[in-house]
């Protein structure tokens, strides 16, 4: 599979430029160094005794094979050639934690009983109203397949990649062919399908001065939103606070201006010393009942 672009729309400004931070691909890769495996995608809801799929991303955002995942109940497994791993959820309901071996931090998942997860047909209970073209996003409901590849997700008539899954949750990467704007989304697996619903997909573009940042200099970074005239929430995070200060706090959330002509959100940094600064920007999108469902 051809390389895909960023999941989380993390925009990295390195002194003067914008570079894609996360790139995903499904083709087999050489196992990454332990320190390169950074992000564990574990379905937030799994079902006792039933299958689920997790995924691991490396430092460049690619799906990472050969990475060991350890669970708080003592179980462990490794991702396969696609950077994912199929596993059976523990029998005991409750919270379980997973972590990448050799990396700090852990991710939680709630184990529900089969009775709690049962439904006569596939249903969607929560999905984002807005997502970015390059971000992964989550869909919650019932009746999905635990094997990620058994789920068929289409967005605007294009196939999407299911990164992680359980009967109750999907983590989806939009197709590269998708254009900004509203799109219909369908989900099906094992001869079950959910009613079609809509998600607005936006493209985030950076407009910034390309000259080096100097100590005491104020620099405005403007994020342009394409695909909607609505105000959307963006979060900026300063990843190099010793080099520059993000005015307004760290992290800082801001609504875009909204509008048909120009939908923008400005962020300002102040140089503390000459050097490389890193600012990440991500869309903040709440989950809710899907539209058109």
Q: What label would you give each PLM region?
A:
Residues 85-92, 172-178, 263-273:
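Short, hydrophobic beta-strand segments
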Residues 56-61, 133-146, 224-228:
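A short glycine/threonine-centered beta-strand motif
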Residues 108-207, 274-276, 280-293:
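Ser/Thr/Pro-rich low-complexity tracts
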Residues 60, 68-77, 156-159, 247-249:
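Short amphipathic beta-strand segments in non-cytosolic proteins
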Residues 50-52, 61-72, 148-150, 230-231:
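Short, ordered, surface-exposed loop/turn motifs in non-cytosolic proteins
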Residues 25-52, 114-117, 207-218:
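Beta-strand-rich domain onsets/edges
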Residues 40-43, 73-74, 124-128, 206-210, ...:
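Surface-exposed, proline-enriched loop/turn segments that connect beta strands in immunoglobulin-like
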Residues 75-84, 163-164, 255-257:
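Short, acidic Ser/Thr/Gly-rich low-complexity loop/linker segments typical of extracellular
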